[in-house]
Amino acid sequence: MIELDYLTIAFGGAIGAVLRYLVSRTINSLLPFSYIPLGTIIVNSVGSFFLSFLMFAAIEKVPLSKEAILFFGTGLLGAFTTFSTFTYETLSLIEESPARGVAYALVNLLFAFTCAYFGMILGRGKV
């Protein structure tokens, strides 16, 4: 039922968005001296790990229902991670300091891909 799918995604997304706000705000307030927005790096890295873990585990180890994938993958983790904030922050940093902006983009991508890789390994049960 399509309407139930939308509600499942919306409920997960609402939780993910609030979690992203809380985690990002907490990280950035604990480390106000940072030259880059660490909150976004943290949420994108953690979200990449858990989404990769979830999907690879669901495919290869423990089949998940469509509803669980919609809730956790599309909804919660989709809203928890934030590509739009990453691109906005990157452009803002590039305007201030091109080197800092590029470094931020590279660190964000490196951490997210590394976390996704470890999520894949653990999701497949290869550890």
Swiss-Prot record:
Entry keywords, A to Z: Cell inner membrane, Cell membrane, Ion channel, Ion transport, Membrane, Metal-binding, Sodium, Transmembrane, Transmembrane helix, Transport
A Gene Ontology BP annotation from the UniProt entry: cellular detoxification of fluoride
Residues that span the membrane, as ranges: 4-24, 39-59, 68-88, 102-122
Catalytic activity, reaction form: fluoride(in) = fluoride(out)
Membrane topology listed for this record: Multi-pass membrane protein
Localization, UniProt: Cell inner membrane
Cited InterPro entries: FluC (IPR003691)
Positions of Na(+) binding: 78, 81
MF term (GO), any: fluoride channel activity
Notes on activation and inhibition: Na(+) is not transported, but it plays an essential structural role and its presence is essential for fluoride channel function.
Cellular component GO terms held in the UniProt record: plasma membrane
HAMAP family, per the entry: FluC
Function: Fluoride-specific ion channel. Important for reducing fluoride concentration in the cell, thus reducing its toxicity.
Entry's family note: Belongs to the fluoride channel Fluc/FEX (TC 1.A.43) family.
Protein's recorded name: Fluoride-specific ion channel FluC
Source organism phylogeny: Bacteria, Thermotogati, Thermotogota, Thermotogae, Thermotogales
Gene name as annotated: fluC
